Swiss-Prot record:
PROSITE patterns membership: G_PROTEIN_RECEP_F1_1 (PS00237), G_PROTEIN_RECEP_F1_2 (PS50262)
Family recorded in the similarity comment: Belongs to the G-protein coupled receptor 1 family.
Record key words, sorted: Cell membrane, Cell projection, Disulfide bond, Endoplasmic reticulum, G-protein coupled receptor, Glycoprotein, Lipoprotein, Membrane, Palmitate, Receptor, Synapse, Transducer, Transmembrane, Transmembrane helix
Biological processes annotated in GO: adenylate cyclase-activating adrenergic receptor signaling pathway; adenylate cyclase-activating dopamine receptor signaling pathway; adenylate cyclase-activating G protein-coupled receptor signaling pathway; adult walking behavior; astrocyte development; behavioral fear response; behavioral response to cocaine; cellular response to catecholamine stimulus
Species: Homo sapiens
Cytoplasmic face residues: 50-60, 120-138, 219-272, 338-446
Glycan attachment residues as annotated in the record: 5
Subcellular location: Cell membrane; Endoplasmic reticulum membrane; Cell projection, Cilium membrane; Cell projection, Dendrite
This protein's name: D(1A) dopamine receptor
Primary localization: membrane
Cysteines joined through disulfide linkages: 96-186
Length: 446
């Protein structure tokens, strides 16, 4: 008997020690995730507040709205759930309903802002002239207001009126569920109607829009890259054919194969960039929303494949929230924001003063292309920088390209209809960072 009791005590102690180790690891991981989310999104907000040229770009309004929604996820949602995960129960009592409303509101706002950014990028690329006229600060604020209003309506009203909860099968079950939610946990089961409707509005419609817009963006970029490559080959071909030997006879000229390889690398780079944007978003949120629609149809004793326990479901909840820590890296790490971050953190003092060689290709409606190159020191921020990026930003202004064209070399080429300006660095790392409307006279609009 004594041996059995000792073994039982040792087994219990081992379980307790293992449980304590798991809690410590969980606390470290969740703390790191929360801190990274806070740091990344705070840097985005601080950069826009600190640097005026970032505030002057309409497209950055959407990035700021996204950063605010992700920052609210890190402040109003993640810490409370992290404490509950570590403690093993919900210690905040009746705050549960308010927390659930914040969770739905902030997560929905983050996803809808991602959707708005994709639509904004598509408009800027497909109709640059119309975009420049109609995408005013007022229009941007209207789009942002719609996203946030929809997020509030889908969260606070149903939660405060208890429309989101599944109806209990009996009065005793209802009392037990209510007591459990307010004391021990905050994992209220959603009703089937609310789970499906909220998932459709918060995720499935936005992800469908994002897939369509980014697919069309890739097709437009692919078409323009191939068009530019064809014009480059024609220019090189014409130049080579003009070369003559000592006898005055032209040298046989051939099509350069390097242009085909460079075009393929550019297309691959664009595809990788868009794949990262969509892949990260889908991998983070899709598992949660699939389970969110399936679990309301599972009974209390179901053992079906997708009827998982609450602990496994919580893992996918954290996967979705982790998207808020990745958004600043994906959507705010263009050249302007990187320079702003370096200045805010003082990193440019520690980094070597390397120059980034950039080639700008501007093509107007009459088919005239202007090629120019300049070197931009890393860590420097221009006082008046009005560039707006395609991924995740698009349309640029006239002042920067006018300066570039003043030092550039003009090369007349064949006919080309849409105006396009693409930034290509010398190692074929394509970011497609500018699309600049050009008038028929070859001048940028003022």
């Amino acid at each position: 008997m004594r041996t059995l009791n000792t073994s039982a005590m040792d087994g219990t102690g081992l379980v307790v020690e293992r449980d304590f180790s798991v809690r410590i690891l969980t606390a470290c991981f969740l703390s790191l995730l929360i801190l990274s989310t806070l740091l990344g999104n705070t840097l985005v907000c601080a950069a826009v507040i600190r640097f005026r040229h970032l505030r002057s770009k309409v497209t950055n309004f959407f990035v700021i709205s996204l950063a605010v929604s992700d920052l609210l996820v890190a402040v109003l949602v993640m810490p409370w759930k992290a404490v509950a995960e570590i403690a093993g129960f919900w210690p905040f009592g009746s705050f549960c309903n308010i927390w659930v409303a914040f969770d739905i509101m902030c997560s929905t706002a983050s996803i809808l802002n991602l959707c708005v950014i994709s639509v904004d990028r598509y408009w800027a690329i497909s109709s640059p002239f119309r975009y420049e006229r109609k995408m005013t600060p007022k229009a941007a604020f209207i789009l942002i207001s719609v996203a946030w209003t929809l997020s509030v309506l889908i969260s606070f009203i149903p939660v405060q009126l208890s429309w989101h909860k599944a109806k209990p099968t009996s009065p005793s079950d209802g009392n037990a569920t209510s007591l459990a939610e307010t004391i021990d946990n905050c994992d209220s089961s959603l009703s089937r109607t609310y789970a499906i409707s909220s998932s459709v509005i918060s995720f499935y419609i936005p992800v469908a829009i994002m897939i369509v817009t980014y697919t069309r963006i890739y097709r437009i970029a692919q078409k323009q890259i191939r068009r530019i490559a064809a014009l480059e080959r024609a220019a090189v071909h014409a130049k080579n054919c003009q070369t003559t030997t000592g006898n005055g006879k032209p040298v046989e000229c051939s099509q350069p194969e390097s242009s085909f390889k460079m075009s393929f690398k550019r297309e691959t780079k664009v595809l990788k960039t868009l794949s990262v944007i969509m892949g990260v978003f889908v991998c983070c949120w899709l598992p949660f929303f699939i389970l969110n629609c399936i679990l309301p149809f599972c009974g209390s004793g179901e053992t079906q494949p997708f009827c998982i326990d609450s602990n496994t479901f919580d893992v996918f909840v954290w996967f979705g929230w982790a998207n808020s820590s990745l958004n600043p890296i994906i959507y705010a790490f263009n050249a302007d924001f990187r320079k702003a971050f370096s200045t805010l953190l003082g990193c440019y003092r520690l980094c070597p003063a390397t120059n980034n060689a950039i080639e700008t290709v501007s093509i107007n409606n009459n088919g005239a292309a202007m090629f120019s190159s300049h070197h931009e020191p890393r860590g420097s921020i221009s006082k008046e920088c009005n560039l707006v990026y395609l991924i995740p930003h698009a349309v640029g202004s006239s002042e920067d390209l006018k300066k570039e064209e003043a030092a550039g070399i003009a090369r007349p080429l064949e006919k080309l209809s849409p105006a396009l300006s693409v930034i290509l660095d010398y190692d074929t790392d394509v970011s497609l960072e500018k699309i600049q409307p050009i008038t028929q006279n070859g001048q940028h609009p003022t």
